[in-house]
Amino acid sequence: MITYNGGNYDVVVVGAGHAGCEAALATARMGYSTMMLTMSLDAIAMLPCNPSIGGTGKGHLVREIDALGGEMGLNIDKTFIQSRMLNTAKGPAVHSLRAQADKTRYHIEMKKMLENEPNLHLLQGEVVDIIVEDNTVKGVVTKTGAIYYGKAVILATGVYLKSKIFMGEVNYESGPNGLFPALYLSEKLKALGCNMRRFKTGTPARIHKDSIDFSKVSVQIEDEEIVPFSFMNEALEKEQIPCWLTRTTEETHRIIKENLGRSAMYRGDIESTGPRYCPSIEDKIVRFSEKPSHQIFIEPEGAETKEMYIQGFSTSLPEEVQVQMVRSVIGLENAIIMRPAYAIEYDCIDPTQLKASLEVKHINNLFSAGQFNGSSGYEEAAAQGLMAGINAVLKIRGEDPFILDRSEAYIGVLIDDLVTKGTNEPYRMMTSRSEYRLVLRQDNADLRLTEKGYALGLVKEDRYERYLLKKEHIKNEMERLKTTNVSPTIANPVLERAESTPIKVGMSLYDLLKRPELTYENIKEIDGTRPQDLMKDAQFQCEVMIKYEGYIEKQLRQIDQFKKLENKKLREDIDYNEIDGLRIEARQKLNAIRPLSVGQASRISGVSPADISVLLIYLEQKRRKKGEVE
């Protein structure tokens, strides 16, 4: 191949999905020239599967991205067509915002943002090779022979590496939605010593809206009050588009069971691992054979299209079987398929080869993010992209990496799980993965992370001022609630209506709000000094902090214990073979993962509590020797 110098940049980002977009915007906004290469400019921030952002655990990630100065939250606030808060019957720790996206507008708005970023250059092209000299990345080579040099390179290749589509007996090399696959980069990465693996995911069919019998399906109404994803938006008003709910039938299950032998997964054509928490419909029917039916959600793909997404109905069965299956579902008897379902298989890296900064351990200045790292989902990808972008800049500057631990953010949980434990299937974020979810709520992501984003230069002055104002409102309101007392004469009529125990002596509003049956709203008439300009976010924070005070304090004590082990740092160059007392498996795992702290070491599969005790003794001996020398 004849090559030529395409240009020199501080950072080269490979891929323009959700990881690539956040990575490129972060590096450019931090003042570094960035080249962003993508297989197709028409697929920037594409939503190839579910047309939604957020959901359980994922909504937390979007809020954290926003708090750090990322773009995903702002973009979905501009382009959503329906918004719902999930898990509202449970406590605030698991409340998760989810928005149905207009997928075309989502792409357009994100592309516009990238095009208008001064330090960012967008280019359509396929990267086929990576230049590495002396274990340090120097740039990338495209299919047309252009070499783009960079001080750091971020791989955000999504599901495109050697990607292959499966529909029954039919399979062919392709990216999602009929786009080109990237067929060459995987082998180059293997040659550079990267341990690659094969994962799979899938997407359901899209059907024509006019072919649905809406009289037979249930409408799923949106929330009246729209809660924005971005902390920069106080309130949003928009006419929303509903989703619908239906169910499979006995006939659906019969068709699937009779054709299981034609499923690419059950035929054995697909040997890779799929996402546990997003199984295909044939997998659900085999695994849960006792269930007479399964829920199916029908979701619009946008305001200007009649394509409808059938959530919960992904499959790798042949196209003609898909037609029968879809038409056996209640309300879809005359459904017309516009895009058939398919499974897609792709290459990704074993994430235990990455540092917590998302830098590849054996190749300096090469970072990676998103589905390439073994995760699933747009939100997980965007979170990693943001962190990879930040850390690429910090590496160029010669500064320490920016790492969030498990007690600081869901982003910290996500990355720690990937690089410490690895994953044998596409990793999905859920609230249950966090040990400290009462502290890591989606509503307080700005209070946890905005200060950090500001220090990095990603949070601009207007956002920072809004954050400071919210903090001040919370502080002042908490003080007011503690010092404002109400008498039994005033309080008891309100308490009676709320079926709350009457009081015999005066009580502060703070103590009244501790009662689970009382809310900010139903004590309004006995709260004569409530500020009229109190921010809604601040009001919510106060109520949560008061009601869950004891639980939060308990979790903060647990975090203090967690931090003690996290603060016991381990050098990256330790030879664990030389530490007496470690078991062979522990030595192998510790040498492979190279944890940054005793806390991280304790989370590695195969490292026992006894091994951790050995490490603590080793560190104490090192500390004493250092003290004696000094």
Swiss-Prot record:
Source taxon at top rank: Bacteria
Coiled-coil intervals: none
HAMAP family reported in the protein's UniProt record: MnmG_GidA
InterPro entries to which the protein is assigned, alphabetical: FAD/NAD-bd_sf, GIDA_C_N, MnmG, MnmG-rel, MnmG-rel_CS, MnmG_C, MnmG_C_subdom, MnmG_C_subdom_sf
Annotated protein name in UniProt: tRNA uridine 5-carboxymethylaminomethyl modification enzyme MnmG
Sequence intervals crossing the membrane: none
Function text: NAD-binding protein involved in the addition of a carboxymethylaminomethyl (cmnm) group at the wobble position (U34) of certain tRNAs, forming tRNA-cmnm(5)s(2)U34.
PANTHER family: GLUCOSE INHIBITED DIVISION PROTEIN A (PTHR11806), PROTEIN MTO1 HOMOLOG, MITOCHONDRIAL (PTHR11806:SF0)
One GO CC term on file: cytosol
Cofactor: FAD
Residues the entry annotates as binding FAD: 15-20
One Pfam family this sequence matches: GIDA
Record-annotated disulphide pairs: none
